[in-house]
Swiss-Prot record:
This is Phosphatidylserine decarboxylase proenzyme. Catalyzes the formation of phosphatidylethanolamine (PtdEtn) from phosphatidylserine (PtdSer). One of its GO terms (cellular component) is plasma membrane. It is a peripheral membrane protein. Pathway: Phospholipid metabolism; phosphatidylethanolamine biosynthesis; phosphatidylethanolamine from CDP-diacylglycerol: step 2/2. Keywords: Cell membrane, Decarboxylase, Lipid biosynthesis, Lipid metabolism, Lyase, Membrane, Phospholipid biosynthesis, Phospholipid metabolism, Pyruvate, Zymogen. The keyword Aminoacyl-tRNA synthetase does not apply. NCBIfam families: PRK05305.1-3 (NF003679). The gene is psd.
């Protein structure tokens, strides 16, 4: 589900301060827990090893802490508030809009050869890497396609790189396709959506590890309201208005 800000609290003193810190620091997606734990394990091993051997292993502890901190930042899962008006399509990912054009949806979805409006978002290593539903509706297709791990910001990535495509149909019959695309560093696509799932706009449905790209295919005739070079915020930035 979409992560939304909590209601205002009436707590005071240390409890209020702790709550402010929690609200300012984004939670971590569960997919990041093993990576953070590994970094902390290295830190612990350095501490224990220094006690046992007497050797200076501060460098090992620092490496472990640095790795754990980096993973916590990468797997952050901040709150987002999707638009409340009907008929909008929001960005499925944080990042830079790198392509706005028309293209045929992935062949594995069997949607024919008609070109559809497409908006592509490139996620750098520093962006939030959870993906969110661009629109409310039912998942009617999920297809994984193996492929290369080329640079995700280049045009061939959409057709040649490893990808997972999700096709969503709204209650009114409109369809939107969102495609998770692997990149040079992104070697693991995680998709939690399954056929028959009912998604609400802004719901978290997947994650790509370490740099990637998201392609969103819009209904025929749709005019995107964003521009190439614009920053997109997953679950909040409106890509198009279908009304």
């Amino acid at each position: 589900m979409a992560r939304r800000p909590r209601a205002e609290s009436s707590k005071e003193g240390p409890a209020h301060l702790l709550e402010l810190v929690r609200s300012a620091v984004p939670p971590v997606h569960s997919a990041g827990h093993p990576f953070i734990s590994a970094g902390l394990a290295v830190t612990s091993a350095g501490a224990v090893g220094q006690v046992v051997t007497g050797r200076d292993l501060r460098w090992l502890r620092r490496v472990g802490l640095l790795a754990a901190s980096a993973c916590a930042v990468f797997f952050r899962h901040p709150s987002r508030v999707p638009p409340t008006r009907a008929g909008v399509v929001v960005a499925p990912a944080d990042g830079m809009i790198c392509v706005i054009d028309s293209a045929t949806p992935p062949a594995e979805l069997s949607m024919g050869n008609m070109s559809l409006p497409r908006v592509s978002i490139f996620l750098s290593l520093l962006d939030v890497h959870v993906q969110r539903a661009p629109i409310s509706g039912e998942v009617i297709a999920v297809q994984y396609q193996p492929g290369r791990f080329g640079a995700a910001d280049l045009a061939p990535a959409s057709t040649e790189n490893e990808r997972t495509s999700v096709r969503i149909r709204t209650a009114g019959g409109t369809e939107v396709v969102v495609v998770q695309i692997a990149g040079l560093l992104a070697r693991r696509i995680v998709c939690y959506a399954h056929i028959g799932d009912k998604l609400t706009i802004g719901d978290t449905y997947g994650l790509i590890r370490f740099g990637s790209r998201l392609d969103t295919y819009l209904p025929p005739g749709t005019e995107p309201v964003v521009q190439v070079g614009q920053r997109a915020v997953a679950g909040e930035t409106v890509l198009a208005d279908l009304t």
